[in-house]
Amino acid sequence: MKNEGNILPFARGTCVAPFGKGCADYVAGGGGSGEVTTDRVYNLIQGLSFAELQGEITYDHALADYYTEYVKRLYAKGMKPGLIPEAPFPSELAAKANTPGMVAVIVISRFSGEGWDRCCGSKLHSVLKNDILKQEEKIFPHGDFSLSDEERELVSQVTKQFSKVIVVLNVGGMVDTAWFSDNPHVQGALLVLQGGSMGGIAIADLLLGEENPSGRLVDTYARSLDDYPSTEGFHATSNSVAYTDDIFVGYRYFTTIPAQNKNVVYPFGYGLSYTTFGKKVLNAAFDGADISLTVQVTNTGKFRGKNVVEVYVTPPQGILRKAHVVLAAFGKTQTLAPDESVELTFRFPLARVASYDEKRAEWILEKGDYEIALGESCMDLQPIKLRVQLDDDAVVEQLKNHLVPSQLFQRLNADGTYEQCAVHAYEKDSCVLHRQSSSKLEGIVPEVVGQGYVDRTMESTWLSEGFQEVANGKQELESFIDSIDDDALIGMCGGQPNTGLANTYGFGNQKKYGIPNMMTCDGPAGVRILPDCGVTTTWFPCATLLASTWNEELLQEVGRVAASEVKENNFALWLAPAVNIHRSPLCGRNFEYYSEDPLLAGKLAASLIRGVQSNGVGACVKHFACNNKETNRKESDSIVSEQALREIYLRQFEIIIKESQPVAVMSSYNKINGIYAAENKELLTDILRGEWKFEGFVTSDWWNHAEHYLELKAGEDLKMGCGYPKRVKKALRKGAITMEDIKGNVRHLLQAMLRLD
């Protein structure tokens, strides 16, 4: 992020003074489904130790021991990585370490997780708090976006005493960066996010120049939490979130709304390298539909490295809401030696930057000039000499309106004003059953139905009859489904008991019909097996860090490797990736998601899914859709315009479905415009299957608050962690659902199972 005077990478023999509890308190990833049971997590001090053993650098052992012992004591008291207060500043040790040539490295770490949102100061706090959030508030009374008072004192003391200072950010999401960007006494900064179990080693390699940074920001880093338009209403109520920022999310807001660009510290797409690169457009053409570009990238510096090419489009400002600039394509080079060149070729439809017209229910390219540019970030653009002009509006796709809001009271315009919207009451609840209380829906273990544990490597056993005939092409799937009794069909639409190492339950499990019990597993940072099982797996970097590579080829390889562990441990479906948009820095689960930009998130996640499914296991993309707040997530209503839904919050899912066809999609807990996502036919059937041609099955998130029969009728095929067959049968007797509906759900499940090894 910052490298004044080329302070990085360290020269051989550099002396390093580690500061901040973060140098020992390394946060490998976030909490919840993204937490992995692994053999060991390496922190920066351990990374420096390895480098010292190799004769690369030396480091101050007294400081390292001070922070190591401090962190060890608090871990022993049950505190989690990233959720311990900053250590008192070691004045005497710092004075001894302040020798000529010494470089101080300050590490700032943050932790967040599933089920709670990041603390944000008393002015904005949610009234709903769990124990972890209460603990976080004690450590960060001003919110964890900003430095704590203790961290500010640490920075103040270090920058006073040391002439060379580097900052390392071990965080899972957006934080304040103005404090070092504006500080001339901090010469360098690395955003390392959360790098999994090997993160501390990787940080040391980056500091030493063993590896050359090549990432780009996937989010906008603003001066203040208040600069993000999503902040004001984030905790206005725990029952809903009004997406009044509309399509202006992240860089779309800061580059479009007047005067907001001044609040950006580091823009989307920004990133530095230890080397330099030159770019030259060799060819640019527009054939009336597609834009073609050939870009030559040359390493003009002294270090080996990779480079990202970002292509942006500025559309004409017509009648419809539009962002000033939109990412349209991207690519990454292989590692280039000094003076080495490579050509990257791009071809993408202009329709990629179309706008959704709610009045006419169509994707449209408005007439006018479309400016194409290469960018070193979304705010550092070099125009390409290419005439892209439409003389008339062009309809890209005609659709039907879906998910139209009735409670959105206002929405942001491109000039910074707000359009006032008509508000209507929600329609009456269509459920014919008395809904169960939330206390009856939480954490119920599936009843034991069908067969127990079966080794999935023994194909001759787990598909010995019935369904095996379908798999072998000896029986049509439809006739097989017709042979299954109603109780078994209904039972298959709910989660099944754990077997083997599983802790997130299975699906299928009808021994009578030769249908195996296929296990699922969390999570987005690797296979998550409970610690008491005695099995460890790889803790991969968090999704935001993976996305920061802007490297589709790498993401596909990560998917392939992760799937090998899924398969090795007898799981059939990996509950990953998670691709919700980084609408607000406050979302506690942002580390698990990719970006504020749907194209970047969609393309990279699609690559990961292709890698996963090339290994014979299934990927389950989640959370569909608008899961951008963890507080009261099972009841919160995401109130959002159809244009914002289609252009921002559904777009990455659309890309994923069309480019990688995941085996499964997981619906989100929340409501969307008054209807649970899990009960929303317009979302799960009309859009997902009708418009996007999804071929897999849809599962709920675990123990949501939706009604099972309404989920089935909407197009959700599997309720996890368990189903409610008695309630489904009651709805059948009332005529609210039919067995033909349920057969359709089972068909989706069985078709997906046939795709798995």
Where are these regions (language model features)?
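Short beta-strand elements
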Residues: 381-397
